[in-house]
């Protein structure tokens, strides 16, 4: 089976991860002790994508839980689902990273990374046919960003041909937890551009807005926010875990969504989202779900897709959905909003259909968009980064852990390059840019000989 090993790093990553395992366990009819008490054979049919079957029919998540301080992991262990996880898959340091990327990446995290990799290796060896890894972490703190990216690059080294997907919580525009977020985030993006296959960008402020405005929760708490994210996480892998008419997996996802290797930062959305009292009054149709998931208010990252253009997009429908209707809706979206899509990638929306709806729903859809509007996040973080880096503010915390200023400069220019690539492809049109594209894509090898000329010669 196509197994996925899940890694959660740092406080934010562990809280999202814990919620994700609650949601997935409920879908597969697995209770908090790992025993199966579901109602349908389909629930167990491919449960091994995320679970290992232990002795006595117990299902154990393929999860590795990592943090540089024991607090959050202890809370998960003591919580209602603590008995679900394998006890030796918890790897905790004692000192914490103190919101310092350098501590997570070079000092404290580097000391712990080998013991984490041992657990990851053991989980990977327990798989028949490992599909890839998914990492949940935040980019603003120390452990999730510093140690999370260290793990991503180490796993990349050891498993170069497996998929690497990360669910990365970006710093929010208005809500800032720590003053050094721009540093941590920029240094992390620098790593993720090189080592990840797909990065799903999430931010707390967008999640707050969805909870507050759409779900009408007056005081959203982190569990509410994390539930939104886990809905998408479960939707993306649903067709690996349940039978469907149009299947998808992590590799198909990347092949269909990443037109250029560096542009793998996606925004995600989920439908149906409606306040508790309103649900009964809404029709759930494919058209309704499609409309909602393409709605800018539905995006879980704080950037407006109307400010850019979609390179590609992917929709994951669940429930009893007509494939024909899905195809028609995808076509209609592209025809109606043609200005929002790049014209030199025809049929840019991929759809997948899974027959089993999530718990408590008759139909749902998860959305992934590769839009040039994602540059808003990088621009925002970049401007905060330059403002502080110009004055070398807070830099001694990083250089004290052995980092060099050069690394900051490199990370900054890598992120700026990413923004200018996004701008270049947004502005490109079919006619005018063909020659320029050939040059941009590195088709010019020596002098002005193209690949074809070279081989012909």
UniProtKB/Swiss-Prot annotation:
GO biological processes: microtubule-based process
Required cofactor names: Mg(2+)
Molecular functions per Gene Ontology: GTP binding; GTPase activity; metal ion binding; structural constituent of cytoskeleton
Magnesium keyword on record: yes
InterPro entries: Beta-tubulin_BS, Beta_tubulin, Tub_FtsZ_C, Tubulin, Tubulin/FtsZ-like_C, Tubulin/FtsZ_2-layer-sand-dom, Tubulin/FtsZ_GTPase_sf, Tubulin_C
SUPFAM superfamilies: Tubulin C-terminal domain-like, Tubulin nucleotide-binding domain-like
Ranges annotated as spanning the membrane: none
Major place of residence: cytoplasm
The protein, known as: Tubulin beta chain
Species of the source: Porphyra purpurea
């Amino acid at each position: 089976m196509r197994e996925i090993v899940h890694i959660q790093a740092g406080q934010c990553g562990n809280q999202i991860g814990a919620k994700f395992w609650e949601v997935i366990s409920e879908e597969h009819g697995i209770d908090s002790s790992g025993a199966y008490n579901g109602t349908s054979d389909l629930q167990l049919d491919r449960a091994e994508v995320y679970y290992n079957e232990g002795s006595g029919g117990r299902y154990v998540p393929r999860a590795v839980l990592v943090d540089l301080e024991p607090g959050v992991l202890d809370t998960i262990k003591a919580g209602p689902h603590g008995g679900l996880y394998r006890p030796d898959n918890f790897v905790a340091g004692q000192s914490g990273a103190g919101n310092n990327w350098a501590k997570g990446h070079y000092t404290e995290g580097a000391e712990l990374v080998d013991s984490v990799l041992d657990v990851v290796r053991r989980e990977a060896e327990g798989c028949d046919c490992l599909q890839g890894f998914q990492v949940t972490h935040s980019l603003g703190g120390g452990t999730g960003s510093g140690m999370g990216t260290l793990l991503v690059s180490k796993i990349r080294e050891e498993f170069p041909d497996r998929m690497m997907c990360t669910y990365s919580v970006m710093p929010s525009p208005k809500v800032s937890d720590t003053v050094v977020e721009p540093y941590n985030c920029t240094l992390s993006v620098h790593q993720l551009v090189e080592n990840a296959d797909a990065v799903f960008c999430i931010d707390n402020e967008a999640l707050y807005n969805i909870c507050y405005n759409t779900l009408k929760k007056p005081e959203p708490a982190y569990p509410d926010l994390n539930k939104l994210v886990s809905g998408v996480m479960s939707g993306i892998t649903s067709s690996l875990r349940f039978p469907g008419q149009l299947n998808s997996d992590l590799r198909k996802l990347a092949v269909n969504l990443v037109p250029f290797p560096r542009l793998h930062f996606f925004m995600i959305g989920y439908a149906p989202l409606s306040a508790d009292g309103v649900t009964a009054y809404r029709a759930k149709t494919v058209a309704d779900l499609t409309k909602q998931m393409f709605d800018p208010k539905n995006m879980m990252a704080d950037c407006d897709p109307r400010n850019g253009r979609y390179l590609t997009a992917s929709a994951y429908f669940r429930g009893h959905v007509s494939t024909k209707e899905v195809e028609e809706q995808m076509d209609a979206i592209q025809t109606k909003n043609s200005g929002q899509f790049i014209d030199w990638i025809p049929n840019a929306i991929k759809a997948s259909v899974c027959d089993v709806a999530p718990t408590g729903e008759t139909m749902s859809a998860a959305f992934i968009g590769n839009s040039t509007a994602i540059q808003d996040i990088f621009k925002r973080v970049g401007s905060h980064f330059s403002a502080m880096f110009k004055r070398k503010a807070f830099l001694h915390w990083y250089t004290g852990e052995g980092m060099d200023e050069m690394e900051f400069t490199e990370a900054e220019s890598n992120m700026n390059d990413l923004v200018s690539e996004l701008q270049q492809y947004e502005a490109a049109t079919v006619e005018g840019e063909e020659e320029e594209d050939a040059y941009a894509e590195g088709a010019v090898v020596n002098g002005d000989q193209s690949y074809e000329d070279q081989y012909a010669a």
